[in-house]
Every structure is written in C-alpha cells, then in structure tokens.
C-alpha cells in the first residue's frame, strides 16, 4: 500500500484539538488572537499538514505560499526563515526582518526554530510581536 504523508487538517479540527489541550481561559485568548489576526490586513491563516492539527500564518501575497509562522494544536509554535522544502532553501523573510525576529525570540541563525514560551499568553505575545514586525512597511 502507498505511504501517506502527514494529514491535511481543517481549521475546525485545529480549534477542536486546541480546546481539548488548553484551559478555557487560554483557549479563549487563543481564539481572540486568531479572530483578530483573521481581520488583519496582510495576514492569512491556513490549516496545515502535520501529525497533529496545525495552522500556519502567512503574510503579504496569498499567491506566495510560504507561511513563516506555524502553530500546533498542542500550543507549540515555530517560525521559519527559509522554505526548507526548496533546493536551495528559499528565504521567506528578508534578512533584515529575520535578524530582528531572531533577536526578539532569541533564535539562532538556523532556518527555523521553535518559538519558546512558558505560557500561552507569552506565546501569543511573541507571535503578535513577530506579526507586527513582519507587517511593518519596508
């Protein structure tokens, strides 16, 4: 039989799974954050693929399918500076923005890293700060 890749999840599946793993308060905070993000010009949320439900957040042209921020339904998140699925890896964010984000998150100069946080509030604050940085005009 053929090997199937990671499952493509829907946004609703992501929200259902997120709700199971978070306190009511954290879930509400996450939901509010995503609702606000959906209304933000230049930002786009897309359900992603993975072992568990995942969403990715993209910026700018919808035709540009590189979504630098990813969030798993277990409340963990990551940021990608380059699309590692292309050869050679293609920059997702310009170097100046990537540097600012690395400084903000304490990330090394790798192509991607986890966004570390001790709470959902801290995680969302970091994602908001990164989003703001990315959406700033050049």
Predicted regions and their residues:
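Polyanion-binding interface signature
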Residues: 2-116
């Amino acid at each position: 039989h053929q090997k199937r890749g990671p499952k493509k999840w829907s946004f609703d599946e992501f929200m259902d799974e997120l709700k199971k793993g978070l306190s009511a308060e954290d879930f509400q905070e996450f939901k509010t954050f995503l609702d606000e993000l959906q209304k933000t010009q230049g930002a786009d949320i897309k359900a992603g693929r993975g072992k568990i439900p995942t969403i990715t957040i993209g910026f700018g042209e919808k035709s540009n399918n590189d979504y630098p921020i990813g969030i798993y339904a277990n409340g963990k998140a990551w940021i990608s500076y380059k699309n590692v699925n292309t050869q050679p890896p293609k920059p997702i964010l310009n170097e100046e923005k990537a540097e600012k984000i690395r400084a903000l998150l304490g990330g090394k100069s790798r192509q991607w890293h986890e966004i570390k946080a001790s709470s959902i509030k801290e995680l969302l604050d970091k994602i908001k700060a990164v989003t703001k940085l990315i959406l700033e005009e050049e």
